[in-house]
C-alpha cells in the first residue's frame, strides 16, 4: 500500500487521509527516525511522507475507511466561507441520518426502546453457530431465568418469533396426549390460547370470565374440582383491557389440586415482579419486545425443570415449536435448531443489562408513576376506564370512547402521531375503547406531555 497526495503516484485510490486518530509511540518513533535521516533533503517533511517512510521501515499501519465523511481543511477565510456554504450542510445531513427520532409508543407493544438497545443491533456479522454466539445465548437464557427464579430449578428456552409463538410452544408441547387442559378466557389473549388448543384438536375446556371484571375464584375452584384437568392455561395480564388476573392465587389453587400451570406473561414479565416458585407457575411465555424493552423477534418459555423433563419422549405435535427438542438441542450444542435472529438477540442482551440496572421493581414503579398521570387526566376530562382501578395492571388502560359526535379516533391518533405519540384502538364486543400503554422506555415527563395533549384535544 502507498500513501501519497499525488494521485498519479498510486495505482488505485482507496481513501483520502484526513487525520490520524490513533498513533502508537513506536510508530511515532519510526516516523521521527525517518524524518531525521532525510532532514537534509526534506527539512520540511510532511507527516504523510514520514508515515509512508515508517511503513517502508517495517512499521505496520492500519487504515480505517470512513464513508460519507464531509470535511474541509480550513487555512484562511475563503476556506471557511466555502466550508460553511458547501461542507456544513453535508455534515448536518450526515448527522440527521444518524439521529433516531424519539417516538413514544403508547401501544401495547412493541414498546419504546432506548437508543442503546437500538444501536446494539449494529454489530459485527457472525455465524450463529460460532461458540462465541452460543455463549451469548447461554448468558441471555441464564439472566432471563434469574429474573424469575433459581437457575438450578428453572430454565429459559429461546425461539425466534412473537409472543404468540411462545404461547403455541407451551400449549402444544406441555400438555401430553392424555392430558386435559382448562383455559381461562377473559379477553382476546385467553381466546387465542383456546384457538391454539382447538387447532391441535386437544382435549380442552374453556372457563369463561368477564373481560373487564375480576375472576370469581370460588367459581373457578368449583370448575377445577368438577373436571379431571391436568393442566390450566391463563393470561397474567390481559392486554385487551389492562385487567390483571390473580395468577399467584390461581397457581396455588392449581398446585393444591396437582394441576400444571401454563401462563402467558407476554405483557407482564419484566414489569410485574414474578417468582415462579412462589407464584406456582410451571411454564410461562414472554417476548423481547414488551416490558423487557428489547426489539421484536425473540420469544422465550420459562420452564420448571422437573416439569420440563417430564416432556421427554412425548409425541411431538409439531416440529419447529417443540419445547423439549429445542431445550435438549441447545443444552448439548449451545445452538438453536434453526437460525436465530442475531441482531435481535444482541439487542435483547443490551435490554437485559438495562433491566438489571433499573431492576424490575423500580421499572414497575416507573410504569405506575406514568399510569397515575394517565389516570388523573382521564378523571379530569370526565372520561371512563373500562376496568376498575384496583383490578388494573398499571401497564395498559382501556378508556371508553366518548359518545361526543366530535370525537374521532382517527383524528385523535393522527394528531397524537404528529407529536410523536402512538396510540391504539380497542374493541371488546360492542364496547369501543382506545388503549393507552405505558410500558417500554417511557418517562413520567413524557406521560405528562401526552396528558397535556389529551387536554388540548378533548377540550377543543
Give names to the regions the model predicted:
Residues 102-159:
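A glycine-/small-polar-enriched, mobile loop at the entrance of the PLP active site in fold-type I
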Residues 215-270, 283:
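Active-site phosphate-binding strand-loop segment of PLP-dependent enzymes
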Residues 112-113, 289-377:
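Active-site C-terminal subdomain of aminotransferase-like
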